[in-house]
Structures are given as C-alpha cells and as structure tokens.
Amino acid sequence: MSATIISGNFIASKLREELKQRIRILSETWMQPGLAVILAGDNPASSVYVRNKARTCGELGIHSKVFNFSADTPQKIILRQIQDLNANPEIHGILVQLPLPSHIQMNEVIAAIAIEKDVDGFHPCNVGALATGHALFRPCTPFGVMKMLAEYGIPLQGQHAVVVGRSNIVGKPMALMLLEQGATVTICTSQTRELASHTRSADIIVMATGKANLLTSDMIRTGATVIDVGINRLADGQLCGDVEFSGVKEKAGYITPVPGGVGPMTITMLMNNTIEAAEHAKAKAQIEARCGSMQ
C-alpha cells in the first residue's frame, strides 16, 4: 500500500485562480488589495519567506510593501510603523514576520495591529474569537491544512485527530479548527511520553514540532492521514519534514510531502485573508458612503 499524496502545490494553484478573480473585481470596482510586511532583523529564513510572499502578491495582483528594520531597531519605531499602516486605507493586511529580535515583545507588536488588518490571525482578539468559532481571520497554516483535508474529502466528524505541537501559530489553532469540525482532538508535543501510543490510535495526525523525521511508520496505524507541517534542513542541505516520509507513505492512507505540501497553502491562505480584508474594507466604505449621503 502506498499513500495518496496530498499536493499542496495543486490545491494552491487551483485556489489562486479563484483569488485572481476576486482581486480583479476589487481592482475594477474599488481598489487593489494591499499587504504590508514588517521584517525586523537579518534572519535568512525570514528574508526568504518574505520574498516568497511578496512574489506571490505580485503574481496574483496584490499590492505589497516590505518594511525592513535592522535587528537593533527600538520596539517603539516598529509600533509607530504599525500605527501608520493601521491608518493607511490602501493597506488592508499587515503581517509581522516572526521571529522578532529578542528585545522586541512579540505580543505587544501583534496586539498593535488593527484587528481588521490582522491577516495572520495572531491578534489576541482573533485568537479568542477562533476559540468560539467566530475569528475574523484564521491563522494561515492550519487554515491551509483544513482546506487540504476538505479538498481530498477526508472526513473529520467523529475522527480522532492527534496534533503534535503546541505553538500559537500552528498547534493550538489547528486543534481548535479540528474541534470545530467535530473531530476528537488530542494535543501532544515532541516531549510527550510514549508519543507513539497516542499517534497509533489516530485517524489524522498533524505534525508541527520542527523535529526532523520524528514520526516513523511504526508510530501510525494503517490508513491514517498524515499532515506534515514541519520543515527542517538536514546536515547535507536537504529539506525534510517532521515525518519520515519514505517509510510512512507506505503505511498511511494520505500524506503531505515536504516540500510541496503545507507550505504553498500557508502563503495562499495569507493571500486569501488579505483579499477578505480588502472585501470587508470595501463593504464598510460602501455602508459609510450610503450613510453619509442620507445625512
């Protein structure tokens, strides 16, 4: 048995064609969607991620602008930039590339973003709203995973899902989204004792630990769906996920590859959230215009 490969590249390409149509409508009837990215420090991986996001914006027709800050930039300067972007009507989404330099308080910076422009879904209000099923924007990586599961018709209602990872970016929101769809969710970490005893009972496993090849074929049941969010670089320069792909794919029912799995979906859902933010802004502007004309 060999697993069906869940291609993030394929699903992302399909979704991006739909996004282009929404962007075209916005651009023709109102204005071009705009995304601002704040990059602080000189983390090479962050620079690559930001370039990829800016390139995707250009390919789809979203206006983007990157604001680069040196690693020693005071936090107040970054907060001032966010305030300016909050007030800029041509910017509909604001993204702060993580991680930030150690002297900057991430929570304070994220909380400074206007909720209606929080396209990463990390603002405390959006995080709280996600717990009640009413988030304005959903965090992009778990949102992308949910789209992948839906595209391949993988059932969630009543299924046992194990999420390995507890980050605010992936693990926690992933668990909430699976719960929302009726799954029974177990949350583990890379330090969970007897991790295999949990993963072997799972219908769906989401790996998000940053530990290369942590999940092996003896840790899953036959036919399980395995989603690999991890991306790690080995000593020889090769990329791999948190899943030992070659072995696990012979036992799983569905599996995502690394690269070409979850990664393309994360960026695509960021684009989706930016477009939604622009659509919300357009609707608000139209309502305000109608109200103004009635006075």
UniProtKB/Swiss-Prot annotation:
- Write the Enzyme Commission number(s) for this entry: 1.5.1.5, 3.5.4.9
The record ties this protein, via CDD domains, to:
NAD_bind_m-THF_DH_Cyclohyd
Please list the GO biological process terms of this entry.
L-histidine biosynthetic process; methionine biosynthetic process; purine nucleotide biosynthetic process; tetrahydrofolate interconversion
Binding of NADP(+), residues = 165-167, 190, 231
**InterPro entries tied to this protein:** Aminoacid_DH-like_N_sf, NAD(P)-bd_dom_sf, THF_DH/CycHdrlase, THF_DH/CycHdrlase_cat_dom, THF_DH/CycHdrlase_CS, THF_DH/CycHdrlase_NAD-bd_dom
Associated pathway: One-carbon metabolism; tetrahydrofolate interconversion
Return one GO MF term: methylenetetrahydrofolate dehydrogenase (NADP+) activity
Keywords attached to this Swiss-Prot or TrEMBL record, sorted alphabetically, are:
Amino-acid biosynthesis, Histidine biosynthesis, Hydrolase, Methionine biosynthesis, Multifunctional enzyme, NADP, One-carbon metabolism, Oxidoreductase, Purine biosynthesis
**SUPFAM superfamilies cross-referenced by the UniProt entry:** Aminoacid dehydrogenase-like, N-terminal domain (SSF53223), NAD(P)-binding Rossmann-fold domains (SSF51735)
Annotated disulfide bonds: none
Subunit comment for this entry? Homodimer.
Instruction: Output this protein's name.
Output: Bifunctional protein FolD
Q: Which organism is it from?
A: Nitrosomonas eutropha (strain DSM 101675 / C91 / Nm57)
